Amino acid sequence: MKIWIDADAAPRDVKDLVFRASRRLMIEVTLVANRPVPLPPANRLVSAITVREGADVADRFIATHAQPGDVAITADIPLAAQLVAKDVFVVDPRGELLDDRNIGGRLAARDFFDAARGAGMETAGPKPYSQRDRIAFAATLDRILTRAIKRRDASPPNAPPADAPSTLEPPPDSPQDPNA
């Protein structure tokens, strides 16, 4: 399991909270941006990847490399939709969990406002990042990391499928089922 941060627009508070969680839970974090981003000192679990400049280059990198069960932090709704489809846990910087129940509505709203702006309509930008957003993000991140860790620990990466026959022999002194 890994945490991916769409780092071009992620608030510093979000990155700091993720860095602390990384250190506490021993989870790898990768920041992806089209410019160099500062890394926390003395945390080898955190790395950064600088992609070439261009529209959605960082998003495509994250979408390509994130795996089911990973966690991604992004405010980019099209990227979130791609990640949700890959069974990646997605949290926006304001603490909203984006999943298959709400991503369609968020994508439709994003497309509507994008079309309105394209037609010359002025739309309000996002509100400034607040302490309430920080608290909501911290709570959601904690909840999602707990779920992701439970999922990871419940299914080891090299576990055989549930219907595969066991190749393990019972211990010599264990009772054996005569009907087996």
Model-predicted segments: where are they?
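Nuclease catalytic cores that cleave nucleic-acid phosphodiester bonds
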Residues: M1-D163, L168-A180
